[in-house]
Regions:
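Short Gly/Thr/Asp-enriched flexible loops that form oxyanion-binding sites at enzyme active sites
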Residues: 120, 174-183
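Conserved beta-alpha
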Residues: 76-160
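Short glycine-rich anion-binding loops that position phosphate/pyrophosphate groups of nucleotides
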Residues: 41-45, 168-173, 195-196
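N-terminal nucleotide/polyanion-binding subdomain common to many enzyme families
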Residues: 1-90
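Proline-aspartate-enriched helix->loop->beta-strand connector
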Residues: 153-170, 186
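Short, flexible loop segments at boundaries between secondary-structure elements
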Residues: 137-144, 185-223
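A transmembrane-helix-recognition feature enriched in membrane-embedded lipid enzymes
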Residues: 70-75, 206, 210-255
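Short, acidic/small-residue loops that bind anionic groups at enzyme active sites
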Residues: 85-86, 93, 133, 183-195
Length: 255
């Protein structure tokens, strides 16, 4: 579906509201189409800037969502404001009632052992009638073997889900979807990041005031300091000067 995009360091970030997004997905499913959805925080945008393959995936993806206040702020600084910040943590809880209302089926792929099953149980209790038709946890590897990859494809295709939720961390999940979507019997494939654990109640989300103030990253760091240190204190500080450079390069006409 067509929508406006905003260039953030070479990544075309989608500018649309949550309602517009779900309306689009309903059409995609009903018309038997396919769509790749990438949820892109700052570290994914930086990964795309550094890696041509990742940037190509984001340019070809159907939706590249604004996951994080810094990305929204950057669009405003560049005077091309994105309509709405749409994070994986906001999208995931809305998917289940959306699926119930439309009679759509869901498959959960990824996360650590036990997480997807817990999420399935929690959502089946919370949303009677939700059809979570399968879960699969692949081994923890940088690159899957051909056999492992085929097992994942076979598990998904056996149940033909309308919505495929992939939790392999970004940009790994986005690469996997891009490389395999043509082989998958599904319609909307979403790289959802670490949202499974939060939606399942295994990890708490930041208070609303911290989300609004752009401090959700700090709350996540306090919960998982070892895993998040590089993302927030090594990679993220590079983002601001690059955005400033992009703005003034545009002004001067430099590429």
């Amino acid at each position: 579906m067509q929508h406006n995009r905003v260039d953030i360091l070479g990544t075309p970030v989608s500018s649309l509201t949550m309602d517009e997004l779900f309306n689009d997905w309903e059409v995609v499913i009903q018309q038997g189409q396919k769509a790749q959805v990438c949820i892109t925080p700052v570290n994914s945008i930086l990964a795309a800037r550094a890696t041509a393959r990742v940037q190509e995936i984001y340019k070809n993806a159907d939706y590249v969502l604004c996951d994080g206040v810094p990305v929204k702020w950057a669009s405003e600084f560049l005077r091309d404001p994105i309509k709405e910040r749409i994070t994986g943590l906001d999208v995931l809880p809305r998917i289940f009632p959306f699926a119930v209302a439309g009679g759509f089926t869901i498959f959960l792929l990824g996360a650590t052992p036990g997480v997807a099953e817990t999420l399935k149980e929690v959502m089946e209790a919370k949303h009677p009638g939700v059809q979570i038709v399968g879960t699969f946890v692949p081994p923890f590897r940088v690159v899957f073997s051909k056999e492992e990859n085929q097992q994942m494809i076979d598990a998904i295709n056996a149940v033909k889900p309308d919505l495929l939720l992939v939790s392999l961390t970004a940009p790994k999940q986005d690469i996997w979807i891009a490389e395999n979507l043509a082989k998958l019997d599904t319609h909307v494939a979403i790289g959802i990041g670490g949202a499974f654990e939060v939606a399942a109640g295994m990890i708490n989300r930041a208070p609303v005031w911290m989300q609004t103030a752009g401090l959700e990253w700090f709350y996540r760091f306090l919960q998982e300091p070892k895993r998040m240190f590089k993302r927030y204190f090594v990679e993220a500080p590079v983002f601001i000067p690059l955005i400033i450079q992009q703005k003034f390069s545009k002004r001067s006409g430099r590429p």
